Structures are given as C-alpha cells and as structure tokens.
Amino acid sequence: MESIRAGVSRERLTHLQQLEAESIHIIREVAAEFENPVMMYSIGKDSSVMLHLARKAFYPGKIPFPLLHVDTDWKFKEMITFRDETAKKYGLDLIVHKNPDGLAMGINPFVHGSGKHTDIMKTEGLKQALNQHGFDAAFGGARRDEEKSRAKERVYSFRDKSHRWDPKNQRPELWRVYNSQVNKGESIRVFPLSNWTELDIWQYIYLENIDIVPLYFAAVRPVVERNGIKIMVDDERMPIGPEDEVKQELVRFRTLGCYPLTGAIESDATTLPEIIEEMLLTTSSERQGRLIDHDQAGSMEQKKRQGYF
C-alpha cells in the first residue's frame, strides 16, 4: 500500500502522485462530511482504481462505507466472478442490488433495446438502492475525459430528491473547496477521478499493481459482429440467428458493461505495458463500443438528468 515514490524527490510529486493525493483527499472529505456515503462499484478499471484509493485513504483500517453494485443481470460472467473474489479478498461490505420490477418484467437488451434496459435495470435500479439504504453521497468512477456531459460535471455533483442532475443548478468548486450541504432527501454524486485520463488510469494500475478483470486483456473470444460492433457471446441467452457468424477472434475490451451492449476491439495487447502503448497511439474514444452512448444525440446527458450515474 505504498505510494509511488521511485525516482521522485520529497519536494516534488509526479502528476500521478498529485492525482492520487487529490482523490484520497476527496474520499476522506466525503467520509467526514456525510452521514451515510456509499461507493459505487461497477467492477471496471476505474472502479478498481477508486477502490484501491479508498483502501489507501483509510489504511490500515477498513473502508468506513459499503460498496454498491447495481447488477443488471447481464454483466459478463468474468465481471461477477471478479466482483465476488475482490469482496472476499478485502473483506468488503458489498451490497448487490437488482431491480426486482425489471426482473419480473423480463427486461433485457435484446428484446427491449439498450435505452429501456438501461433506464429500468441501471437508472431505476440505482435510484431504488439509494432510496432503500438512505445514502446521502455516492462515489462514482466517472472521468471528465470520457464523454462531453461528464466533462461539465462537478466533483461534487448535486442531485435533487428524485436523483436528477441539473447542469444549471450546480455549485462552484473554487480552490478545491466542496459544498456538501444537502437537504433531507437530496444527495451528492462524488467523482474522485474527475481529473484523471484513461492513460492515467492505466499507468496507475501498472505502477500500483492493481487487479483488474481479465476481459481488459486480449484473448481469443467468440464474437458476433452487429452494426460494425463486435459483441462477445458470453452465455446461452445471446440470440444467434442464421445470418450470424460466431468467430473466434483476438479481442479485448476498453470499457465494460452489460455484455450485449459492450463492443470488443481487435487487439493483441496481453500485458499492461502493451495496453499503455496502445493507449498512446489510439485516436478513438474508449466509449466507442458502448451502445448506450449511441441511443440518440446527447443520450448520456439525458440519462444523467434522469438519475443515471
């Protein structure tokens, strides 16, 4: 659990050390200021970094708040295995919530589409969990470089009693001073990784030796190409039509979510240094393979206004 210090004087921090210090400061601030915070755990690389930072923030003590995973029932099998192993390894207080109404209706991305699936299983599921446990602050692993609606979001993102985000009703954050005042029923979404980039995340994972889901590394996997996007066949629920051709291809994932809505990329990067080298050369967004971002123009901002993370 040591900080990155190799080759750096005590008087000057590297940019990763500065980002680490800022994130730890934010995490400690939230733990001190709010009555009932929670950390969202989506099992992806950003969540893994955020969890690592939370463990550092309170080491050698335990993390003083629970983790919450909103499970849509359509995550990659390797993600669920990794989630359970991580919770057991670190003795985490992990809450897993599935929207019971969505499960009863049989909501799934193949039949109902990405928009309805995301709204019911993720957005409504998240709001259910936050209301059920009375959380007044929720950490998220979003970064400003990911997507334009996230680029204009504050570190402390104010949400009303219906968990809605109004970009015009946010608070100034001058000199890293954060306003944590909320009325009963209101909440704050907190983003400690706001100032990190995708490359920062990968370099930090490498330097700190952070465990991540194996799906981020290239391997031969069964994929079906639909609308130019390679979808991995993760279980028997994937409908395979006569026109579909399942191919074994060397692919990996830059971002993870529900497997029917997450596209793989062709890659031979099987190690962290190879992924970092690939990131230095790429000219495309990491979210190019997320189908929920392509529902319609401004779809991510609309989802956030409705309560999505």
Swiss-Prot record:
InterPro entries cross-referenced by the UniProt entry: PAPS_reduct_dom, Rossmann-like_a/b/a_fold, SO4_adenylTrfase_ssu, Sulfate_adenylyltrnsfr_sub2
Gene Ontology molecular function: any one: ATP binding
Pathway info: Sulfur metabolism; hydrogen sulfide biosynthesis; sulfite from sulfate: step 1/3
Catalysed reactions listed for this entry: sulfate + ATP + H(+) = adenosine 5'-phosphosulfate + diphosphate
GO biological process, one term: hydrogen sulfide biosynthetic process
Regions crossing the membrane: none
Pfam families cross-referenced by the UniProt entry: PAPS_reduct
Alphabetic keyword roster: ATP-binding, Nucleotide-binding, Nucleotidyltransferase, Transferase
EC number(s) on file: 2.7.7.4
Family membership noted in the UniProt record: Belongs to the PAPS reductase family. CysD subfamily.
Function statement: With CysN forms the ATP sulfurylase (ATPS) that catalyzes the adenylation of sulfate producing adenosine 5'-phosphosulfate (APS) and diphosphate, the first enzymatic step in sulfur assimilation pathway. APS synthesis involves the formation of a high-energy phosphoric-sulfuric acid anhydride bond driven by GTP hydrolysis by CysN coupled to ATP hydrolysis by CysD.
HAMAP family, per database record: Sulf_adenylyltr_sub2 (MF_00064)
Subunit record text: Heterodimer composed of CysD, the smaller subunit, and CysN.
Protein known as: Sulfate adenylyltransferase subunit 2
Taxonomic classification: Bacteria, Pseudomonadati, Pseudomonadota, Gammaproteobacteria, Aeromonadales
